[in-house]
Amino acid sequence: MKTDTSTFLAQQIVRLRRRDQIRRLMQRDKTPLAILFMAAVVGTLTGLVGVAFEKAVSWVQNMRIGALVQVADHAFLLWPLAFILSALLAMVGYFLVRKFAPEAGGSGIPEIEGALEELRPVRWWRVLPVKFIGGMGTLGAGMVLGREGPTVQIGGNLGRMVLDVFRMRSAEARHTLLATGAAAGLSAAFNAPLAGILFIIEEMRPQFRYNLISIKAVFTGVIMSSIVFRIFNGEAPIIEVGKLSDAPVNTLWLYLILGIIFGCVGPVFNSLVLRTQDMFQRFHGGEIKKWVLMGGAIGGLCGILGLIEPEAAGGGFNLIPIAAAGNFSVGLLLFIFIARVVTTLLCFSSGAPGGIFAPMLALGTLLGTAFGMAAAVLFPQYHLEAGTFAIAGMGALMAASVRAPLTGIVLVLEMTDNYQLILPMIITCLGATLLAQFLGGKPLYSTILARTLAKQDAEQAAKSQNAPAGENT
């Protein structure tokens, strides 16, 4: 009898200990399942919309090119039609942005950063259709823009939409789902889940509230977005450059030199972007007609440029494998680099709905390949492969300009599937980042956000000054 009683007591003690352990575990992990569920919904929606946006842009581009092919034998029709089609498509994007959702202009990433700090509004019912349709117009016109900016902003706005639909009122949920959508958007644009996570942690580090709940939600959203992307597009890397050879240790100093070059180029590029933005602002002065006509002219010129020098137009994804393969001479690579710098400045700084990641990756590829080809001639004993410098250059310009070296490294490695180049990439991107910081360069997105907030404050101050006068009349 005593044995049965002691056995019963022992079993009860074990059960109580298990319950206590479970209770402690539940107290330790306070992640609300509702937020994780909504993060999965946000990631799935962002993946679906991101894939739809990519397909829609490709459809518009194919329709435009197909129309040009029909009149390819008639030069007197081909050139005007190339200008008109691209101009009309671009004007659609500029008009929608200016008329209905000014915050949908440009990349959209600074807007998400501002929204994470509760400094910028998130009007998803306006931004989602304007960014999607406007991006179809500008990117479909062949302008030098990327789709990553739109998908990041679309993802963030989808996060806020889901929050409103489920009527979540907590500030933590609002912040977390916005960041989750942005990370899922980058992942959906580049098929780069780890880069999407790092982008939020690194690039948006001043705004992102890193805690157990938010990081789990970001992971969940990125996973769902990546799964959706791969269901529709497969698992192949989006930039096919083939498997490149590893960089020997005795050649790593060349990658540091390349990083120094990009450390000088990055701040200059950022300065040119801001100066070009000011130039366009002085030109149109906020008038919608001037702004739309200006956008149409830029879009039309990109359409013409696509006939003359196709490599100088478009986002750049098609150019990267060709340039990295060494199909161009050093002189031609530098010429295309300069041409694309000009077109990137015109397209992005004018406020067109579109990103700058893809154009920067193409610019980095061009300059990196040119450096690699020149180094191969100067140092034949190393048996250098120019493609490895192209890969390093892709991330270096982004690291120097955006000041997000980890994101640049991981993004390029995921996009190209050349993980063996991680060491030369670290050397190049770190050198570019440190020198850009030493030269006083400011991160591009943070600077654009600061200018946007300054403009917002000036407009609010002007309204407050005019309010008494309006009330007295």
Curated annotation (Swiss-Prot):
It catalyses: 2 chloride(in) + H(+)(out) = 2 chloride(out) + H(+)(in). The keyword Cell inner membrane applies. InterPro entries: Cl-channel_ClcA, Cl-channel_core, ClC. CDD domains: EriC (cd01031). Coiled coil: none annotated. A motif (Selectivity filter part_2) lies at residues 146-150. It comes from the Bacteria. The record marks E203 as: Mediates proton transfer from the protein to the inner aqueous phase. Keywords: Antiport, Cell inner membrane, Cell membrane, Chloride, Ion transport, Membrane, Transmembrane, Transmembrane helix, Transport. It is a multi-pass membrane protein. GO terms for molecular function: antiporter activity; voltage-gated chloride channel activity. A motif (Selectivity filter part_3) lies at residues 355-359. The keyword Ion transport applies. Residues 109-116, 177-189, 193-201, 387-401, 402-404, 405-416, 417-421 dip into the membrane without crossing it. The chain crosses the membrane at residues 33-69, 77-100, 124-141, 148-166, 215-232, 253-281, 288-309, 330-349, 355-376, 422-438. Gene3D superfamilies: Clc chloride channel. GO terms for cellular component: plasma membrane. Chloride binds at S107, I356, F357, Y445. Residues 70-76, 233-252, 310-329, 377-386 are periplasmic. It is found in: Cell inner membrane. The record marks E148 as: Mediates proton transfer from the outer aqueous phase to the interior of the protein. Its main location: membrane. Disulfide bonds: none annotated. Belongs to the chloride channel (TC 2.A.49) family. ClcA subfamily. HAMAP family: CLC_ClcA. This is H(+)/Cl(-) exchange transporter ClcA.
